[in-house]
Amino acid sequence: MKTEMYRIVFSNDAKKDLKELSKKAPQAVKKLSKLLEEIQEHPRTGTGQVERLKGYDGNVYSRRITHEHKLVYRIYDEVIEVLVLSAFGHYKK
């Protein structure tokens, strides 16, 4: 039985981060795309040093895009959705 894929949604901050990432670290965009594909199937496990972040409420995780940039996202299991919070630099609240 195939599980349902998580829908990826971007916060306004994450949309800005994607623009910055494509300008300043275009090689990282390809890696980010692969991470997002993986997150659609299994958001809590996989590549990129998956880590649940303790300083946030709920299911907030991070994955390494590069040594300089982290992908931070919140998982909403009840609606099968992942909200990307940031994708440029390190953690932001």
Per-region residue spans from a language model:
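Enriched for short, Lys/Arg-rich terminal
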Residues: 1-7, 15-30, 63-70, 74-93
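Residues that recognize and position ribonucleotide moieties
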Residues: 7-8, 46
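Generic recognition of well-ordered alpha-helical segments
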Residues: 16, 34-37
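A short, surface-exposed loop/turn module that caps and links secondary-structure elements
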Residues: 37-64
